[in-house]
Swiss-Prot record:
Residue ranges, annotated region (Flexible region): 83-159
Identification of the protein by name: Autophagy-related protein 3
Family: Belongs to the ATG3 family.
Chief place of localization: cytoplasm
InterPro entries per UniProt: Atg3/Atg10
Region (Handle region), start-end ranges: 239-283
Biased composition (Basic and acidic residues): 106-120
One of the GO biological process terms: autophagosome assembly
Subcellular location: Cytoplasm
Transmembrane segments: none
Misc remark: Kluyveromyces marxianus proteins are shorter in length and have a more ordered secondary structure than their S.cerevisiae counterparts, which might contribute to the superior thermotolerance and solubility. K.marxianus could be therefore useful as a new model organism for further elucidation of the molecular details of autophagy.
Gene inactivation effect: Impairs the formation of preautophagosomal structures.
Region (Disordered): 89-121
Length: 308
């Protein structure tokens, strides 16, 4: 709990900045956090803002009262994190601050500790098929229907026999961390019959590599009560997000180059050559949820539909 207490003091003492450094640091201002939250709620209706129906909320004056935190309830968790680890045979290496990467030799571990940038790139490279679909792209009925069919096919491939005793549910919260200027995730778990999970039980759903370094037991900071949760420490979020943003930019740039080459062969003029291929700040939380799954592999975050 000492770590939690120190974290709370740091949150309290860190000054708020309203100057955007999103593209250079991967950090967000409170205003950008609200924009990203609005986009997440729009694209994924299972997420919502806290609204005005909470009488026990501890408000932060730099955020709108109705947008203090994001919440999605009763997210299923069918398997413990250890089930996912057992299927992996690759080694992992520590990249500092609790993050670990797969497939590295002992020699690479030593050199990796000296190269923070390559560590973050390797962590980001573990996230496959990173694609963001803009609003206008997701409105096409045919494409959306095909995406849904693909998702259902993937779900069929992953069907396993789940015993009721192993099924759990989580309420997930995302709030703004003033000390790191990034989103911060909190998890509150429940057994299948609705009984709150103990901290030790919730830690069973955190990937083993992250339990002692990245996850912290602490009360939900935005409630006046003492509701215990497990938080995901945000110390590396900004750096990893920077790498993921570059990954999105490179992917879009390649796609645009391919389209431009096709247009050139067909004598079409490329009217989109000056479009920025980077990640928009309002799309930040969609990518954030994508890499949070490396910490909570069994929790079925709602990030795989319209926004990808």
């Amino acid at each position: 709990m000492l770590r939690s207490t120190l974290s709370n003091w740091r949150e309290y003492l860190t000054p708020i900045t309203h100057t955007s450094t999103f593209e250079t640091t991967g950090q967000l201002t409170p205003e950008e956090f609200v924009k990203a939250g609005d986009y997440l709620v729009h694209m994924f209706p299972t997420w919502r803002w806290n609204g005005t129906d909470y009488n026990n909320v501890s408000y932060k004056d730099f955020l709108p009262k109705e947008k203090q935190f994001l919440i999605t309830r009763k997210v299923p968790c069918k398997l413990r994190a250890s089930n996912f680890v057992e299927t992996q045979t690759t080694e992992t290496r520590d990249v500092g601050d609790g993050w670990e990467l797969e497939g590295q030799s002992e020699g690479e571990r030593e050199s990796g500790r000296e190269d923070t940038k390559s560590n973050e790139e390797a962590l980001a490279s573990n996230i496959e098929d990173l694609q963001i679909v803009d609003d206008d792209e997701s409105e096409g009925g045919g494409d959306e229907e095909q995406l849904l069919q693909n998702e259902l096919a993937d779900d069929d491939d992953d069907i396993v026999d789940i015993k009721p005793s192993t099924l759990r549910y989580y309420d997930l919260y995302i709030t703004y961390s003033t000390s790191y200027r990034v989103p911060k995730m909190y998890l509150c778990g429940f057994a299948n019959e609705g009984t709150p999970l103990s901290p030790d039980q919730m830690f069973e759903d955190i990937a083993p590599d992250y339990r002692s370094k990245t996850a912290t037991i602490e009360p939900l900071p935005f409630f006046k009560g003492n509701q215990i949760s497990v938080s995901i420490h945000p110390c590396k979020h900004a750096n990893v997000m920077k790498v993921l943003m570059e990954k999105v930019r490179a992917s879009r740039h390649r796609a645009r180059d391919t389209e431009a080459q096709k247009n050139a062969e067909e004598d079409w003029e490329d009217l989109q050559s000056d479009i920025d291929d980077g990640l928009r700040v309002d799309q930040y939380l969609v990518v954030f949820l994508k890499f949070i799954t490396s910490v909570t592999p069994g929790i079925e975050h709602d990030y795989t539909m319209e926004g990808w």
